[in-house]
Every structure is written in structure tokens, then in C-alpha cells.
Amino acid sequence: MQTMYQTMNDAELAAAIDDLEARVAEVKARELKLDMARGKPSPEQVAISRPMLDLLSADSDLTDGGVDCSNYGCFEGIPSARALAGEFLGVDPSQTLVLGSSSLLIEHDSVAMCWLKGTCGHAPWSEFSAAHDGARVKFLCPAPGYDRHFGITEDLGIENVPVRMTENGPDMDEVERLVAADEGIKGIWCVPKYSNPTGDTYSDETVRRLTSMKT
């Protein structure tokens, strides 16, 4: 999926650079001091969780389900945290993993491991192109979606393929058509509950079709 600038010739790129530099200079001249970070909760929202800072002390019992949480803990995450996640997600705690606080880091590591090592005994994704006459590995990207998800696959050289996002999740007719016809498609970026940025939640039918479709 080419960007707008990748489709431009040299003259068009030069003109675009001049235009952007002029616009940047105009904004800088205003001497604004803006926080452009995205997704930051308001101070009021952060304040809701502040009482948690007072729950533990050096004398607190840090054992949870037989796990010493002051030490390395366990791979799946501490039991009470998994139970809480299961409650939020509406699933049994045994179906949850509680890892680091950054979902983006977990997603990056998962895709990078597939790229380097493959899945379930299959060849690494990085070897796909050489074995298929130069065809690229692809990832479906429901749009609008989270650009930093798309940046992970793009950074690895994976081709992002946009799929229309609906209020019930990705357009499953299009998803099923694409994956049935192209073995280079290895995955799809999904935020099934409160999708970023639309806030939509995937319908039960969308989830069923995602988990049962032929690839």
C-alpha cells in the first residue's frame, strides 16, 4: 500500500516539501505550547485509580494464589489479575494472559516472533517471499484503525491491505474473500472491543466468522 508521497515524481515531491516547510514555519511562528499526545486520559480519570497507591506497604502480603508477586511471578500473569481481565472480557480466567502494561509492545513482539521464527512449526514469515516468487507477506488492516498497529507490520516489510471497518467490525465478506484467495495474508489487526478509533465492538457474528473462516 503506497503512501501519497510514494506516488509523486521529483517535481511534485519538491513542491510538497516546500508547502510543508511553509506550513511548519507558520505554526512555529505562533509559539504555541500544545500537548499533541494521543489517548491520554484526563486528570479526573487518572484520579480514579490513585487510591490504589495506598493499598500496599512493605508489610503487605504479596502472595496471590500461591504465587510470590514480589518475585518473578508466573508466565501467564498473577491469578487475581487474570480473573479481573476475564471479568472485563466475559471469558474464563484460564483464557487470559496478563503481561506487560503496553499492549503495543506485546503485539510488536508477537508479530516479530512470527516474522523471525514462524508459528506452530511453520517456516518464518520472512522466508515467504523467497519461496513464493517474490510475493509479499500481507496483513489485513480494518480502516479506520490504529495507525501504530499498521506501523508494526509496515516496519517489517509486510504489505498492509486495508479492509472497510463497519459498526459490527471489519467487512467480513471482504475479509473472507481476500484470505481465501491469497496465502500471503498472515493476519489481521483487530481491536474487537471498543475499536480504536471508532469505539465500535465486534458483533458475535463477526467474531464467529473470523474464527471459523477458511484460510
Kindly label every feature range from the protein language model.
Residues 2-76, 80, 86-87:
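N-terminal "arm"/small-domain region of PLP-dependent enzymes with the aminotransferase-like
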